[in-house]
Swiss-Prot record:
Belongs to the class I-like SAM-binding methyltransferase superfamily. RNA M5U methyltransferase family. RlmC subfamily. It comes from Vibrio vulnificus (strain YJ016). The lineage of its organism: Bacteria, Pseudomonadati, Pseudomonadota, Gammaproteobacteria, Vibrionales. This is 23S rRNA (uracil(747)-C(5))-methyltransferase RlmC. Its EC number is 2.1.1.189. Catalyzes the formation of 5-methyl-uridine at position 747 (m5U747) in 23S rRNA.
Length: 376
């Protein structure tokens, strides 16, 4: 894939952009098999490939420059000058068009980007999420204070007229002078508060602060694969720990007698519950709890426990809890194979029966890995 930002060395996030995609897959596959050297070669299934461009449904843009010349993108690693990334080819074409419009809209609206050196200005980030099922957008302005809200509100009508697909608009207040992406306070500027997404016929509700996979094409296959594995095992009870907005639990519920989804973020749990209501699923329960605390409080494990932890992994304590609870099956989905490999060392009673990786982040070293572990 051709990328002008990579060719000009203005953005090097996609470190393997100039490597043929087939070679990227081979290199990543070999690296994962080496990392998980204890996993039998026969356990590995073929990797799930990504589209090489227009594959991301999220954009996180730093607001840079000045009010008369704002830039959405990143700072140059060489000299700190603003670099616009509104036409990054990983984004869909309608996302690129919207980002380019927003960059000009910020200028004509007179909204000053935040300057971290001078500690002045208002707009810190522009966060964009796209629903691939509906082609609709959620737009979030991360601002230092409420000072810019009047200008944002005043100029919203022409933004919405130019891009009626922008369904949800909000302002997130992040007053702290540090590299935090968002603050606690979310102010909605539209009647709609969430996006509707759909994978494999399963409705998903996306709210501003909920974690959501960034590559919808690959995410759909990740959920479908977990569903198929669970359908083969037919568990009586299943737990989905770190369930987020419920993607795995919602897909797997038809193939288990009871499914319990646990997630500490209450907003994500509210989204998951709404999806379950839309599907009319009666054997699925979601609770806003800490996954480790929930696991520790149980005296008897489910037949199958699915875990999808953040990049830090399960950690030794939770891994050892799961080892003691001794479910017959574990399905572990990870966005960080290194911490996943460390966690597996604390699960000595389990053998990896099936392993597959999903190229959620093409042109990088990152991979989403999912494994089926069976207690011996």
């Amino acid at each position: 894939m051709s990328c002008p930002y990579f060719e000009q060395k203005s953005c090097t996030s996609c470190t393997h952009m100039n490597t043929p995609y087939s070679q990227q897959l081979e290199t990543k596959d070999n690296a994962l098999r080496t990392l998980f050297s204890d996993v039998a070669q026969s356990a590995w299934l073929a990797p799930v490939q990504s589209d090489s461009m227009h594959c991301r449904n999220k954009a996180k843009m730093v607001a840079l420059g000045a009010a008369h010349q704002p830039t959405l993108g990143i700072e140059s690693v060489q000299d700190g000058t603003p670099i616009s990334l509104v036409h990054c080819p990983l984004y869909t074409q309608d996302s690129q068009a919207l980002l380019a419009y927003l960059q000009e809209w910020i200028r004509t609206s007179g909204i000053p980007p935040y300057n971290k050196v001078k500690k002045k200005g208002e707009l810190k980030f522009v966060l964009l999420t796209r629903s691939q099922a509906r082609g609709e957008f959620m737009l979030r302005f991360v601002v230092r204070s409420e000072a810019a809200l009047e200008r944002i509100r005043h100029n919203l009508p022409r933004l919405q007229q130019a891009f009626p697909a922008v369904r949800v608009i909000s302002a997130n207040i992040q007053p702290i002078h540090m590299a935090r992406l968002e603050g606690e306070q979310e102010i909605f500027l539209t009647d709609a508060h969430y996006l509707l997404e759909e994978f494999n016929g399963v409705p998903m509700v996306v709210r501003p602060k909920s974690f959501f996979q960034t590559n919808p094409h690959v995410a759909a296959q990740l959920y479908a694969t977990a569903r198929d594995w669970v359908a083969e095992l037919k568990p009586r009870q299943m737990w989905d720990l770190f369930c987020g907005v419920g993607g795995f639990a919602l897909h797997c519920a038809p193939h288990a007698e009871q499914v319990i989804g646990i997630e500490i973020e209450e907003e994500a749990i509210n989204s998951a519950k709404l999806s379950a209501q839309q599907l009319g699923i009666g054997n699925l329960r979601f609770s806003a709890l800490d996954s480790a605390a929930y696991s520790q409080a149980q005296t008897q494990a489910a037949d199958l426990i699915l875990v999808n932890p953040p990049r830090r992994g399960l950690g030794q304590a939770l891994s050892e809890q799961l080892e003691q609870l001794a479910p017959q099956y574990l399905i572990y989905s990870s966005c960080n194979p290194v911490t996943m490999q460390q966690d597996l060392a604390h699960l000595p009673s389990y053998q990896v029966e099936r392993a597959q990786w999903f190229d959620m982040f093409p042109h990088t070293d990152h991979a989403e890995v999912m494994m089926l572990l069976v207690r011996q």
